[in-house]
């Protein structure tokens, strides 16, 4: 039962952006929000955790919170890719979850994997976006890659790599400034 694997093994380090300066309970997704004043302290820790690693390629979400961390960590020329943006919460962006008067929100809470935010995406939509990016990345000759992105992207990359199941996603959320390592073979 020999299975032909056309892909080279690849190690991917995914870094979540640092803490955002948004009131708790506010849905911000793809909105370009400011970072907390603790950015430099948090980013210093992330950079220290990457020390000694080298990457064949570095990518980042185009949102400022990720570009700033990539730049701080020494990668100002990281390639920006829209597929690495956070979940698009559509009409709910920048509203408190407990103040959203949309009947669709209850459906989303009951089945966030499949139900789209009003005029936005579902978690499954975001997964397809991330899987498409990773499928394309696997065809490149890289052995070690860095990606500066968002909590949802890190979760979906772990699902793609078989580390977690979609139903476990939100209990596996990486802290701000945290790093997840996945291996693809």
Name these PLM-found stretches.
Residues 9-13:
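Extreme N-terminal starter segment of soluble prokaryotic enzymes
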Residues 14-18, 148-153:
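Histidine-centered catalytic micro-motifs
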Residues 15-76, 121:
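Active-site-proximal alpha-helix that buttresses catalytic centers in soluble enzyme cores
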Residues 51-54, 137-143:
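Glycine-rich phosphate-binding loop signature in dinucleotide/nucleotide-binding domains
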Residues 73-129:
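Phosphate-handling substructures
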